[in-house]
């Protein structure tokens, strides 16, 4: 499954958004990928998410694949855009 979202101001919402995003992603069994400007990362990789440099206003493509892909897609999109 895929969805495109605009990243909200996650720095203001979460104390440590990178670690919290990875923790959220690790709560799902599905593979979760993030893509922006030609960069593709695994959302369960702390180093990958740090290098990705999520910022407010970024347009990110989220892709999920696996048993709980619908829940994972909704959870990650809500985390990044709510």
Briefly describe each language-model feature range.
Residues 6, 29, 51-82:
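C-terminal structural segments of small proteins and small subunits
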Residues 6-42, 47, 51-52:
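Compact, glycine-rich, soluble single-domain proteins
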């Amino acid at each position: 499954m895929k969805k495109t979202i605009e990243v909200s101001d996650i720095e203001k919402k979460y104390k440590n958004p990178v670690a919290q995003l990875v923790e959220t992603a690790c709560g799902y069994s599905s593979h979760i990928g993030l893509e922006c400007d030609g960069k593709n990362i695994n959302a369960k990789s702390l180093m990958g998410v740090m290098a990705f440099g999520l910022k407010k206003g970024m347009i990110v493509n989220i892709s999920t694949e696996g048993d709980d892909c619908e829940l994972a897609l909704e959870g990650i999109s809500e985390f990044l855009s709510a």
